[in-house]
């Protein structure tokens, strides 16, 4: 399933993203959206970033570049 950042830009693995709350820049590693509705995929913490130990909701991210 496609996921989108807070500005409705499509997100895919390998893209640089910024965490909106902190301004930290990281790389999207993977998104676990199996068995989620489109609304859940956008708002649940299902995205894993390369250098972070936390999961993020796509709506918390901003795609860079």
Give residue ranges: language-model regions.
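Intrinsic disorder/low-complexity segments in short proteins, especially the signal peptide
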Residues: 16, 33, 53-54
